[in-house]
Amino acid sequence: MADNGQNVDLLSIEANEVQHDAVLDYYGRRLATCSSDKTIKIFEVEGDKHTLVETLRGHEGPVWCVAWAHPKYGNILASSSYDGKVIIWREQSSTWQKIYEVALHTASVNIVAWAPHEVGCLLACASSDGNVSVLEFKDNAWSHVIFQACGSGVNSVSWAPAVAPGQVVSASGNQAGAARRFVTGGSDCQVKLWDFSAETGSWQSTQILTGHTDWVRDVAWSPTVLSKSYIASASQDKTVRIWTSSDLRDWKSTVLNVDAVAWRVSWSLSGNVLAVSTGDNRVSLWKERLSGGWECVKTIEE
């Protein structure tokens, strides 16, 4: 479960275990990390100081991913592990507790991602067993749907914005009838789009985007709500593809060539800058030119 740890500066912790993920919460005040030692650590962030305040234990294998829920649901953190389990943690009265644990998958759960809060309290989980599960908290109870997305394993999942291109957000920030939609990347070299059908209560594949020649390691749907949708996909084929569509049906791709395996892609909050992490320990930043095409504007080497 959860252990209260002594206050320790983040930089003073010896890197005895590989760190797999590090994510700030919505306000940037807390940092969650996870590692091969089967634990999750919570740090308070104040300026340049990171103070360890909690160590969460519950997984039986390396923890690959942590994800903060939107603060409207409270201080909620999800974690996924090689052990095939997904755990939901919540802080109450300054104490972290495990509030839900589920083992729907028969292999590693590689990533978990919360949906935009406008569509509900939903968590998508992608697994090496080829399945995606979607957990939902509603009416004080958890439920789930699980389906096969890629027979050879699902490596990544990313939700679409609650607002489709060209739509207008209401003053309250709520989007009536916001669509439940996400994209996955798999070991079958494909990028797939999925929509939820309220009529059948199931998820259906609406698009299969092909072009990569090796595993798709990561996908990221841009948060932009401009005239087009943008999806970035990172592959072991040493390319990143940027897929664009104005109607969610006809997709075009632009290929960005990189010098090593592309592991991760991440959009800026405004959706106009794409960060690409590659196997040569570099992070490159890309922007779309006004005249079209994409250019690398900065490279950061570790």
From Swiss-Prot:
WD repeats lie at residues 14-53, 58-99, 104-145, 149-204, 211-253, 257-296. One of its GO terms (biological process) is positive regulation of TOR signaling. It is a peripheral membrane protein. It is found in: Cytoplasmic vesicle, COPII-coated vesicle membrane; Endoplasmic reticulum membrane; Nucleus, Nuclear pore complex. It holds the Pfam family WD40. Keywords: Cytoplasmic vesicle, Endoplasmic reticulum, ER-Golgi transport, Membrane, mRNA transport, Nuclear pore complex, Nucleus, Protein transport, Repeat, Translocation, Transport, WD repeat. PANTHER family: NUCLEAR PORE COMPLEX PROTEIN SEC13 / SEH1 FAMILY MEMBER, PROTEIN SEC13 HOMOLOG. Belongs to the WD repeat SEC13 family. The COPII coat is composed of at least 5 proteins: the SEC23/24 complex, the SEC13/31 complex, and the protein SAR1. Component of the nuclear pore complex (NPC). NPC constitutes the exclusive means of nucleocytoplasmic transport. NPCs allow the passive diffusion of ions and small molecules and the active, nuclear transport receptor-mediated bidirectional transport of macromolecules such as proteins, RNAs, ribonucleoparticles (RNPs), and ribosomal subunits across the nuclear envelope. Due to its 8-fold rotational symmetry, all subunits are present with 8 copies or multiples thereof. Component of the coat protein complex II (COPII) which promotes the formation of transport vesicles from the endoplasmic reticulum (ER). The coat has two main functions, the physical deformation of the endoplasmic reticulum membrane into vesicles and the selection of cargo molecules. It also functions as a component of the nuclear pore complex (NPC). NPC components, collectively referred to as nucleoporins (NUPs), can play the role of both NPC structural components and of docking or interaction partners for transiently associated nuclear transport factors. This is Protein transport protein SEC13. It comes from Phaeosphaeria nodorum (strain SN15 / ATCC MYA-4574 / FGSC 10173) (Glume blotch fungus). The gene is SEC13.
